[in-house]
Design a protein with these regions (language model features):
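Periplasmic/extracellular, small/polar-rich flexible segments of pilin-like filament-forming proteins
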Residues: 58-192
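Compositionally biased, intrinsically disordered low-complexity segments
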Residues: 13, 17, 37, 177, ...
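N-terminal single-pass transmembrane signal-anchor helix
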Residues: 2-34, 45
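Membrane-proximal N-terminal amphipathic helix
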Residues: 35-64
Length: 192
């Protein structure tokens, strides 16, 4: 009769240790992958917003009807356009979600202050003129917590207080707040 031998305790411990090391390395790599993906989604969302601004500006310049109607060429402030009307049902950004947070997350914010955003500047402490969360709430105050700025799309009026929906040459800067809460520029000086 043949004697059957299994693994010794030492061999089993070595195998468990190797599996533990591989799992630890895999978890760190996976978390980095998730963080990079969130950053890519935030950038893509801001680029989509920029493309919407550019195509809507072309329609407005040509006298065409645009949706939502709050963004048409007419008397009023740009603040009237960059509000919850953009994330309401049937609006261009109805399905937008913030990749960093869940329900109630900040989607975009509009600023017409005299202080321009610069690349890498913290997104906290600004008082927003308007904006929207993904549940339809309006943003009209400062966001003090850096986490709540992650993934936020930022539209800044470079013409400051002279922003007028009746004009089609309002100069805008579009960007987003990255996973560190710092501003990243997507487009500078685009017309609307």
């Amino acid at each position: 009769m043949k004697k059957t031998q299994g693994f010794s305790l030492i061999e089993l411990l070595v195998v468990v240790a190797i599996i533990g090391v591989l799992a630890a390395v895999g978890i760190v790599g996976y978390q980095q992958y998730i963080d990079n993906t969130k950053g890519d989604v935030a950038k893509t969302n801001a680029q989509s917003f920029e493309r919407w601004i550019q195509s809507t500006q072309i329609a407005r310049s040509g006298g065409l009807t645009v949706q939502p109607s709050a963004c048409e060429k007419k008397a009023g402030s740009l603040t009237d356009c960059f509000t919850t009307v953009l994330t309401a049902a049937g609006a261009p950004f109805e399905k937008f979600k913030n990749p960093y947070t869940s329900s109630g997350a900040n989607i975009f914010a509009y600023d017409n202050s005299t202080t321009a955003f610069t690349e890498g500047q913290p997104c906290t402490g600004r008082t927003w003129n308007s904006g929207s969360t993904d549940n339809g709430s309006n943003i009209t105050s400062a966001i003090s917590d850096a986490f709540n700025t992650y993934g936020l799309i930022v539209i800044q009026n470079l013409d400051n207080a002279s922003a007028d929906l009746n004009r089609t040459d309002n100069s805008l800067k579009v960007g987003y707040c990255d996973g560190d809460g710092n501003f990243k520029i997507v487009a500078d000086n685009i017309s609307f």
